[in-house]
Amino acid sequence: MSELKIDTRLWSSKARNLSPYVPGEQPQHDNLCKLNTNENPFPPSPKVGEAITKVLEQQADDLRLYPAPESDDLRAALAQLYDLDVNQVFVGNGSDEVLALVFASFFLKERPVLAPDISYSFYPVYAQTFGVDLIQIPLEEDFSIDPDAYRQPCSGIIIANPNAPTGLLLSLADIRKLAGEHSNSVIVIDEAYIDFAQVEAGSADAQVSAVSLINDCDNILVTQTFSKSRSLAGLRVGMAFGNASLIEALTRMKNSFNSYPLDKLAQAGATASVLDTAYFEQTCQQVIDLRQSLTAELTALDYQVLPSHANFIFVRPKDGNASAVASALREQGIIVRHFDKPRINEYLRITVGTAAQNNRLIEALQALQKNAEAVTD
């Protein structure tokens, strides 16, 4: 196939100058052990498929009609789950769309937005797309976030919590502190992985999610996703929680781009997922248990493992040659994520898989270690 030649003469200067986000690799090979994009190793609640099937079997004719523009049933279910008013809940076509609307709704060109320098790589893309100045605040040596480093004028702060790709958790006390010190700016807490987080020993926090703060702090907006803990990455459903004024701003912006972001099937499936709390709690705990066992096994192999509150772990091989390890694993059909960036290029981000996937990974790493030892003997 000949190489596609791109003619940019009809492009806007914005399109010409963008540096788009690069999605995680989605290879399609048999017997692949895919541990690179933080998908849930377990299927969604069976009730999701049942709800979607019911729509197709009983309401297929209604697919000619537009879906509910505000996803009323889903928002009501989420409001009940978090003990909120429905006007404090927003839903969109994946949390990536929700985050894009956040940048468009709250961050100003006149004042910068602050974010950690090592975090979700979509944030700089949003900033560039919407013409917002993004100042990236360096993480501490141990990859933690120092709230005092954010004491500067800004139109907002966005922090992934747990952070990605480190998996570290910022306390609710620190989030409340940021909100208090920046009372005229929106503090966005991106909680894509929060359902895998646990209250740390010695913490004064009774909970881990900043949703618990939004009634006290009117400038905190929390985003979440159905992609990770609810195993619905293929359905594309995200949400935001905040005071009614923040949610109204998102709704106005949403209706200026796409008034119907969630189709009928996505709304039905996502609502069923929210209502099946038993399955949700069970699978989240399974991932946490698998994360703990994988952490122990990698530590035994002399890998430095950061304390993770997500469905992935961030690890450093003893010799720091993460790129070589990733390449060697790929040759055996095991895909993990390596970031060729300063400060983290010696680390790998590894999704927590099923017990079988984790065992396959550990066995491959053990074999690599034995081969390396044989070469040096």
Where are these regions (language model features)?
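N-terminal "arm"/small-domain region of PLP-dependent enzymes with the aminotransferase-like
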Residues: 2-65, 152-153
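Conserved PLP cofactor-binding pocket of PLP-dependent enzymes
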Residues: 15-23, 307-311, 315, 332-352
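PLP-dependent aminotransferase class I/II
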Residues: 45, 70, 219-299, 303-306
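Phosphate-binding glycine-rich loop
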Residues: 59, 71-112
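PLP-dependent aminotransferase-like
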Residues: 105-160
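Active-site pre-lysine segment of PLP-dependent enzymes
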Residues: 128, 144-153, 165-229
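PLP-dependent enzyme catalytic core of the Aspartate aminotransferase-like
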Residues: 173, 327-332, 337, 341-377
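Conserved PLP-binding catalytic core of the aspartate aminotransferase-like
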Residues: 288, 300-332, 348
